[in-house]
A protein has these predicted regions:
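Mixed-charge, low-complexity intrinsically disordered segments
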Residues: 116-136, 165-167, 171-178, 249-256, ...
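Bacterial N-terminal signal peptides that target proteins for export
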Residues: 1-9
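Beta-strand/loop-dominated core regions that host nucleotide or nucleotide-derived cofactor-binding catalytic loops
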Residues: 243-308
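Surface-exposed short loop/turn segments
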Residues: 82-153, 230, 241, 261-263, ...
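A structural "domain/chain start" motif
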Residues: 21-88, 93, 98-101, 106, ...
Length: 308
């Protein structure tokens, strides 16, 4: 009976290991410029400003590896150049396939409203004023999470933020404060934006919780040794195990044009033997046939090796 109980405990422990591994791995995400569907116009681009704020918040959360926005802009520029036919497509990035990032976050600003009532006039002296002005701000965002391999929309979520200030107050004249400036964060609109961004980070983390960590084959040294993207910055460690899948052609609904994903063929298991900051080396106990650069490596399907 004791032997049987030990066997059951061993099995349960082994099953728990992939989940533990997945929990420590950080998915690589990229944030694109937000589309502005409001009438707001300012000195700073609302689309770029919101994307920068979300990028910073995702980085500060510590839950993701966030692709630098300038790198994303460079990739998009390369894609645009490829689509124009001015470079060979074989040597360029494919639209919708950002190899470095697993998830592309796209956003739309649907509401960006600020209303004021009352007056800031009143007693003024030395550049300061005492007034009784009430300000209310509201912002609405639509966030979409896109699989960069297939272009499939994994989730779509609306988030919003509201803030207000009012009553007797003393302060410097802040009329004309522009989005993205130092004084903006202290305004009702700045606070509303922060609320929406914080909600967006929480929603993104929740939606991606059950999405398996994914990396890419970046080099094939032999049929049993390869290099994968990610490395130490994503939490990959020596001894971690993954499953390799070859990626087939993208499947598209002929009627709607909807991206249905790609056929994935399981090739086998690999174990990480060494780790660098941005990539890792892994080996397989048996030959992996037809593995190529760009194939997918997933976590959570094989057991992580236990420490001796």
């Amino acid at each position: 009976m004791r032997l049987r109980n030990l066997s059951i405990i061993s099995i349960l422990a082994a099953l728990a290991l992939p989940a533990a591994q997945a929990a420590t791995l950080k998915k690589i995400v990229a944030v694109s410029r937000f589309e502005n569907k409001t009438s707001w116009q300012g000195q700073v681009s609302l689309g770029d400003g919101m994307a920068d704020q979300l990028t910073d918040a995702l980085m500060q959360s510590g839950q993701f590896v966030v692709m630098e926005r300038q790198t994303l802009k460079d990739v998009v520029s390369e894609q645009d150049l490829a689509n124009s036919g001015r470079v060979q497509k074989a040597a360029s990035a494919q639209t919708g396939k950002l190899v470095s990032a697993q998830i592309l976050v796209k956003g739309t600003v649907t509401e960006f409203e600020s209303q004021s009532s009352g007056s800031e006039n009143g007693v003024g002296f030395g550049g300061f004023r005492i007034g009784n002005k009430k300000e209310e701000a509201h912002i609405g965002l639509m966030i979409r999470l896109i699989d960069t391999t297939t272009g499939e929309v994994l989730a779509s979520q609306r988030v919003e933020g509201k803030a207000a200030s009012g009553g007797m107050k003393v302060g410097a004249n802040v009329s004309g404060v522009q989005f993205g400036t130092a004084g903006f964060d202290k305004t009702p609109m700045g606070k509303a934006v922060q609320m929406a961004i914080d909600d967006a980070v929480s929603q993104i983390a929740a939606k991606l919780k059950d999405v398996p960590f994914q990396a890419r084959v970046i080099k094939v040294n032999s049929d049993s040794e390869l290099l994968i993207s990610g490395g130490a910055k994503t939490g990959i460690a020596e001894g971690d195990s993954f499953t390799v899948f070859s990626v087939g052609e993208s499947l598209v609904d002929p009627t709607t044009g909807e991206q249905l994903g790609s056929e994935l063929t399981k090739k086998g298991a690999i174990k990480v033997t060494s780790v660098e900051e941005k990539y890792a080396k892994a080996k397989s106990d048996s030959p992996l046939k037809d593995i190529k650069v760009g194939d997918i490596v997933k976590a959570g399907e094989v057991v992580k090796s236990a420490a001796p």
